[in-house]
């Protein structure tokens, strides 16, 4: 059974006075009878009939709007052919006069008005509910909130609630109920906004799964076909097309394998992204539909693999590389560079630091007609050595000044260095003149023999 909850956020709240309704009604009847009997003691003053406003209640004597006025009947504003639900009129006096009441009588009249106002509101809500009850079969599975209806239907439940919100209605105007409720959008800033909220049904796991399945089928059905493909060809087996989701299987089978391969080859990134976005459940359903009822003995077409689509085929290589090109020439220097190992910068810097620690080099350049450069070395094994380099027109004179032991070691080293230099370029060497001509000829002969042997 539906639970009915009524609330009126804009009307003043009515708090009961602690007495039951029948006791309060008895007091009101007694006070009304007392006022009716004392009618002759008052001085009547005829005025136009005005309805009682909520802000006029509870005012003291001497203020503006003192006293209570009788309510005007509502029958004058009714329309024919419609069921009228409005405010019940107050007890009309015979002469429709105003009375100056005492505080006790005024409080009793206020309580009577509040009680009648609450009863009128209950009658109004009850009439609205009775009018909406014939529409209950049509509202089954519909959820309407703030003037809008949800797209996804839901199943009715036994614990549903019906919430009806009504704005306050002026007591001077009658309330008319139409055949269909008028639902207007809720505007918090506007006073008197009317909102009817229906909440029928509750979403269950079965309904959620059904909604997801329907949305997925709708999305697949709205996918556009290829430009050159007007309809789906019948290439699927009958056992597959007889499944519940036959349109899914038909769309999966209708796409030719060659077309898939061409699209994947032209747009590999797009094909990869689309394949990642496919739902795993859809892939499982499609594979199950394709395998059901298919004879494994027949030849089946396998979809191309991604690596085969991305890599060029052997027969397409000449077309891709139609322009002729020459292979790069490999020189002996390239082989030499390939055999060399790259030295680390840290090792070179360490070697330079060690050499600077072992050598003490001083350069001295003197000016004059003959430029002489002196190089002072302090070696741990040879000791102090001075090298003088003099530039003679057309020649370069180098002189070593050191101890005998140092000179002997240097002479041995110079001889080894001279032999290495002679092998590289013998024509650019000049030997010192000596008394032994045989030794000179022997040195020259030795140099030329080695050079000819290498050639």
Swiss-Prot record:
Localization in the cell: Cytoplasm
Record keyword Cytoplasm present: yes
InterPro entries (UniProt xref): Flagellar_hook_control-like_C, FliK-like_C_sf, T3SS_YscP_C
Pfam family, one: Flg_hook
Residue ranges of the region described as Disordered: 38-82, 430-455
Predominant cellular place of this UniProt entry's protein: cytoplasm
Key words of the record: Cytoplasm, Plasmid, Virulence
Keyword Cytoplasm in annotation: yes
Basic and acidic residues: compositionally biased ranges: 43-69, 439-449
GO cellular component terms attached to this protein's record: cytoplasm
Gene3D superfamilies per record: 3.30.750.140
Family: Belongs to the SpaN family.
Function: Component of the yop secretion machinery.
Name this protein carries in UniProt: Yop proteins translocation protein P
Organism: Yersinia pestis
């Amino acid at each position: 059974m539906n639970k009915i909850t009524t609330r009126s956020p804009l009307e003043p709240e009515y708090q009961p006075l602690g007495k039951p309704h029948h006791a309060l009604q008895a007091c009101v009847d007694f006070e009304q009878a007392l006022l009716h009997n004392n009618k002759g003691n008052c001085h009547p003053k005829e005025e136009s009939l005005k309805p009682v406003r909520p802000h006029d209640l509870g005012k003291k004597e001497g203020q503006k709007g003192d006293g209570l006025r009788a309510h005007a009947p509502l029958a004058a504003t009714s329309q024919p052919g419609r069921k009228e639900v409005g405010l019940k009129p107050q007890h009309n006096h015979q002469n429709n006069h105003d009375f100056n009441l005492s505080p006790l009588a005024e409080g009793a009249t206020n309580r009577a008005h509040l009680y009648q106002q609450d009863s009128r509101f209950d009658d109004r809500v009850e009439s609205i509910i009775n009018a909406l009850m014939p529409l209950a079969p049509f509202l089954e599975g519909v959820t309407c909130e703030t003037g809008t209806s949800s797209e996804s239907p839901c199943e009715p439940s036994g614990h549903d609630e019906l919430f009806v919100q009504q704005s306050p209605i002026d007591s001077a105007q009658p309330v008319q109920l139409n055949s269909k409720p008028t639902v207007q959008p809720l505007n918090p800033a506007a006073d008197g906004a009317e909102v009817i909220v229906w909440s029928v049904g509750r979403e269950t796991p079965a309904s959620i799964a059904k909604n997801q399945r329907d949305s997925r089928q709708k999305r697949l059905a709205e996918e556009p076909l290829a430009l050159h493909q007007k309809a789906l060809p019948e290439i699927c087996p009958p056992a597959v097309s007889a499944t519940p989701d036959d349109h899914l299987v038909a769309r999966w089978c209708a796409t030719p394998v060659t077309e898939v391969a061409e699209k994947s080859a032209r747009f590999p990134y797009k094909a990869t992204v689309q394949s990642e976005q496919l739902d795993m459940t859809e892939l499982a359903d499609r594979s199950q539909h394709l395998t059901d009822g298919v004879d494994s003995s027949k030849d089946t077409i396998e979809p191309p693999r991604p690596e085969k689509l991305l890599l060029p085929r052997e027969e397409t290589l000449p077309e891709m590389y139609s322009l002729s090109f020459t292979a790069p020439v490999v020189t002996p220097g390239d082989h030499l560079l390939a055999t060399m190992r790259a030295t680390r910068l840290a090792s070179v810097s360490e070697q330079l630091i060690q050499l600077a620690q072992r050598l003490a080099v001083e350069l001295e350049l003197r000016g004059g007609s003959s430029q002489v450069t002196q190089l002072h070395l302090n070696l741990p094994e040879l000791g102090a050595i001075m090298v003088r380099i003099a530039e003679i027109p057309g020649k370069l004179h180098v002189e070593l000044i050191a101890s005998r032991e140092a000179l002997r070691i240097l002479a041995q080293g110079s001889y080894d260095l001279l032999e290495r230099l002679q092998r590289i370029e013998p024509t650019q060497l000049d030997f010192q003149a000596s008394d032994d001509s045989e030794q000179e000829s022997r040195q020259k002969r030795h140099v030329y023999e080695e050079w000819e042997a290498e050639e």
